[in-house]
C-alpha cells in the first residue's frame, strides 16, 4: 500500500511539472513573439493599401515609397471602357511629414494575437501629396467626362396592338462629376489601384428598371385604363370610346405614376358637345299655316354638362368600366329625333300675332296675342325655347310698370306668356303700337288653358314669316 501511494505522488508531481513547463513555454513563446512586434508590424497590417504585415518599422518608408513608384489607378467604366490615372501625371509624392510613426507608436506588442484574426487596416490622410491642379486637369481630360452624354431613362411603356408593353430602361453614360472626383481622390489616397465607376455609383442611373416592383404595377394600371369601353347614346346615334383613344390621354411621370390628361378628356367631351348639342341650331319647322320656316337660335335643345361629364368620364376610366350611357346634360330636349320638338309645343307666329298650343299632336288651344313692341326695341325673341316653370299668380315689374297676372309662364329671362286682363283686344298690328316689353300677352282663357296643360321643358317655338 505504501509503494502504491509513493507511485501516485510521483505521477502527480511529474504531471504538474509537465503542465508548468508547457505553460511556461507558451508564455515564453508569446513574450518572444511580442518582443518581435516591438519593432515590427502585426499580422494583416495594411496602411493606405500597402501590405506591411510582419515588416520592420524601419523598412516601412521604403516599402511605401516603392509602392508609390509607378502607381496608376485604373478606371473601369460602363460598356467595357477603361482609362488610367498615373501618379506621375498628377505629381503624386510621399509626404515626408506624415503621421505614419503614430501607427507603430500606438501598437501594443503584447496585443499581437488579435491581428491573427482581425484585419489591421489604417488610412492616413497625409501619407501622400499630389498636385491638385494636375489632378483636376487629368480628371477633366478623361474621356468619360467628355463623351456625348446619353442620359439615363426609366422604363417606359408603349401601346401596341391594344395593350401596353414595357420598354427597358437605358443606363446611359452620364457621369456624376463631383462624385467621380471624390472617389478618384479617395482611391488615390487609399492606394487603391482599381476604381469601378458603376460599383461606386459614379453614374446617374435610371430610378426604375424592368425588375422594379412598380414597373409591373404601372403597366397593369395602364392596361386597366385602356380596357375601358364607353358607348355614348344620342338617340339613334352613338359614339364609342375605347383604348385606341384613351391610350393617347395617358402619361407616366418620372415616379412611374399614371396620369390621365384631364385636358385631353375635356377636349373629347367638348367635341361630343360640338357634335351633339342642339341648343341654338337652325331647325326646319312646319307651321300651323302650312309653311315651313327656319327657326334660328333659342335656348331649347340638348346641351352636355361638359364639366360634369369630364369628371364622370375620368372616374369611369380609373375604374376600367365597360358601360353604355348618356352624357350628363345641363338640359334636354323632348326628343333626339327630327327637329326634337315632338308633338307637344307652343307655337307663336310673330307676323300673324297668333299662338297655337299642341299637346300629344292635338290642338288644345289657339288665339290672337300681343308680343313685344319692335319699334321701342322690345321685340319678343325668336327661336326655339322651352318653358322654364309656371306660376299661379305673379306680380310683374319693370321700368315704369307693375302688373298682377293670374298665369305666369316664363321661357327666356323675364319674357314669358301670361294673361293680360287690362287688354280688350289682341292680334293684328297692336304689337307695333302698344306692344309689350317682350312678353306674350294672351287672353285669359288662352293663358288659363295653356297653364293647365303645360309643364316645364315643353318647347315654345317663336318665329316670323
Regions found by a protein language model. Give the residues of each.
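Surface-exposed, secretory/extracytoplasmic low-complexity segments enriched in Ser/Thr/Asn/Gly/Pro
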Residues: 2-403, 407, 454-456, 461-465
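Exported/periplasmic cell-wall-interacting domains
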Residues: 380, 398-465
Amino acid at each position: 500500500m505504501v509503494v502504491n501511494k509513493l507511485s501516485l505522488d510521483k505521477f502527480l508531481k511529474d504531471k504538474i511539472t509537465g503542465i508548468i513547463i508547457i505553460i511556461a513555454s507558451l508564455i515564453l513563446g508569446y513574450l518572444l513573439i511580442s518582443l518581435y512586434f516591438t519593432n515590427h508590424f502585426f499580422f494583416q497590417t495594411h496602411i493606405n493599401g500597402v501590405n506591411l504585415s510582419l515588416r520592420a518599422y524601419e523598412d516601412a518608408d521604403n516599402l511605401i515609397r516603392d509602392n508609390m513608384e509607378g502607381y496608376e489607378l485604373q478606371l473601369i467604366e460602363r460598356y467595357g471602357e477603361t482609362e488610367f490615372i498615373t501618379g506621375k501625371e498628377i505629381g503624386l509624392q510621399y509626404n515626408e511629414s506624415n503621421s505614419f510613426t503614430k501607427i507603430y507608436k500606438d501598437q501594443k506588442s503584447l496585443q499581437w494575437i488579435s491581428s491573427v484574426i482581425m484585419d489591421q487596416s489604417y488610412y492616413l490622410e497625409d501619407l501622400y501629396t499630389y498636385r491638385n491642379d494636375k489632378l483636376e486637369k487629368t480628371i477633366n481630360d478623361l474621356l468619360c467626362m467628355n463623351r456625348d452624354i446619353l442620359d439615363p431613362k426609366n422604363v417606359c411603356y408603349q401601346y401596341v396592338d391594344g395593350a401596353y408593353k414595357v420598354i427597358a430602361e437605358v443606363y446611359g453614360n452620364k457621369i456624376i462629376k463631383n462624385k467621380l472626383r471624390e472617389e478618384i481622390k479617395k482611391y488615390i489616397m487609399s492606394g487603391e489601384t482599381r476604381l469601378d465607376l458603376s460599383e461606386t455609383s459614379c453614374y446617374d442611373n435610371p430610378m426604375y428598371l424592368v425588375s422594379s416592383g412598380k414597373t409591373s404595377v404601372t403597366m397593369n394600371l395602364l392596361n386597366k385604363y385602356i380596357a375601358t369601353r364607353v358607348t355614348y347614346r344620342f338617340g339613334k346615334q352613338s359614339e364609342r370610346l375605347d383604348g385606341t383613344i384613351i391610350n393617347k390621354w395617358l402619361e407616366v411621370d418620372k415616379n412611374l405614376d399614371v396620369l390621365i390628361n384631364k385636358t385631353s378628356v375635356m377636349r373629347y367631351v367638348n367635341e361630343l358637345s360640338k357634335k351633339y348639342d342642339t341648343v341654338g341650331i337652325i331647325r326646319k319647322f312646319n307651321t300651323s299655316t302650312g309653311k315651313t320656316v327656319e327657326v334660328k337660335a333659342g335656348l331649347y335643345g340638348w346641351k352636355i354638362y361638359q364639366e360634369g361629364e369630364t369628371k364622370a368620364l375620368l372616374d369611369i376610366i380609373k375604374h376600367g368600366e365597360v358601360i353604355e350611357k348618356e352624357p350628363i346634360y345641363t338640359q334636354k330636349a323632348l326628343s333626339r329625333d327630327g327637329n326634337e320638338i315632338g308633338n307637344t309645343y307652343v307655337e307663336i307666329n310673330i307676323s300673324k300675332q297668333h299662338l297655337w298650343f299642341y299637346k300629344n299632336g292635338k290642338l288644345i288651344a289657339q288665339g290672337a296675342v300681343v308680343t313685344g313692341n319692335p319699334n321701342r326695341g322690345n321685340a319678343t325673341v325668336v327661336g326655339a325655347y322651352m318653358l322654364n316653370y309656371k306660376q299661379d299668380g305673379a306680380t310683374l315689374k319693370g321700368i315704369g310698370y307693375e302688373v298682377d297676372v293670374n298665369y305666369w309662364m316664363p321661357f327666356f329671362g323675364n319674357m314669358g306668356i301670361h294673361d293680360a286682363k287690362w287688354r280688350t283686344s289682341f292680334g293684328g298690328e297692336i304689337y307695333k303700337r302698344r306692344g309689350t316689353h317682350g312678353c306674350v300677352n294672351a287672353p285669359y282663357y288662352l293663358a288659363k288653358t295653356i297653364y293647365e296643360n303645360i309643364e316645364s321643358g315643353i318647347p315654345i317655338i317663336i318665329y316670323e314669316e
